[in-house]
């Protein structure tokens, strides 16, 4: 258990008991205990903490892959991941923009989006790990419609009988009728009208500087954001 031995060098500093298990059913849940399924490292002695390394990126990939396998097998019910260093991941040859795309490929999922969830605010993204310029160049009706439908399906699965969805605008003031950009007029309005005709309760596009507060205050169940840092 080379990976565990490396971790044990530090466990006394934080007062945790590390237990190696082969299967989730072998886990013992008690205070101070961390159950570990060991993922072997190729050269653990070469690890340099605080530095970006290819084998660290590969280790992260293998851990996520193992979690997905356990989830698909029904042995675990959810995943909790630490931040993924994209530079290390790419150095190991795993070319993914982030967790979202990696999880989609490992689960053979074609329609997907990143969703941020909290009791008071839920946000789903039309685009994720791409530049703002690329987002503007690739924004299209089909993608926006797919994300609205994903959002509606998710809320229904989460127990919302009549989901109420808001769509954020792309531009300041949601374009101000074309004064500050035409994406709202050319792309968002037509898609929203189509989704409404399909029976989805969706409103927008709404100015990005107010829509999140309105959702937080309970006016909407979820916001469809246009890009990663909106």
What positions do the PLM features span?
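Short, acidic/small-residue loops that bind anionic groups at enzyme active sites
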Residues: 91-118, 196
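Conserved hydrophobic/aromatic beta-strand scaffold that supports enzyme active sites
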Residues: 3, 102, 114, 123-125
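Flexible glycine-/small-residue-enriched beta->alpha junction loops
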Residues: 39-44, 113, 117-119
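Active-site-proximal beta-strand elements of phosphoester/diester hydrolases
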Residues: 36-38, 123-129, 135
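Active-site glycine-rich loop that binds ribose-phosphate moieties when present
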Residues: 101-110, 130-156
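Short, structured patches in soluble enzyme cores that scaffold and shape functional sites
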Residues: 119, 125-130, 169-171
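Mobile beta-alpha loop/short-helix "lid" or hinge segments that flank ligand
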Residues: 32, 116-124, 165
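Contiguous, glycine/small-aliphatic-enriched amphipathic segments in soluble metabolic enzymes
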Residues: 1-98, 144-166, 170-226, 230
